Amino acid sequence: MKQYIIALGLGMVLFLGGCGSQEAIDTYSFGQKVINVGQSEVIVDSPFDFGQLDKIVANDKGQPLTIYAGLDKNYGVYVSATQASTGAPLPTLEEGTKLGQQELTKELGQAGAKAQWTQEPVQMDGVKAVKSTLDAGSNGQTIRFTQYTFINKGVLWNIRYSYSDQSPQGEEINQRVNGHIQVTKKEG
């Protein structure tokens, strides 16, 4: 009888273990992150909460740079916001797009040097933007990056999403949040 109960218990554990879902909606608590920089505000959909990496720092031109990021094994969200400073105006949208691409390519090293960016004009809540994509391969996997670049109320925004092609949850998350960016239209 004792063996029967153990076998039944083991069978139930195996059966119930197979009933679990590996869908991202069951694993992540999707939400929105509101980010304010200067007079500009964006709302970014994300699978998790993420925060500001540092207090406002400066880029190589002395312009204030605010960075927010979140990353786990399936997905990454990166937001940078650059403001103009005295003697260092913001780059144009096209220049800002190229700068964001160059920054990521440099971070990726050899894998980034071999990869090619594609880009297309898009609208983010009526604001002219550029959507850039890059697939960078390394160690038998491909990391997919999508970056949205736009300028709003004196702030150059670069919002980047990333996931591995070997992560089904990463792909599912990407379908839920990629490009879901609101540019608020508050007065003042």
Labelled PLM ranges:
Residues Q3-T66, Q141, Y161-G188:
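N-terminal targeting sequences that direct proteins away from the cytosol to non-cytosolic compartments
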Residues K55, E103-T149:
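Signature of long, low-cysteine stretches enriched in small and polar/charged residues
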Residues V79-A81, V155-Y163:
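Short, well-ordered beta-strand elements
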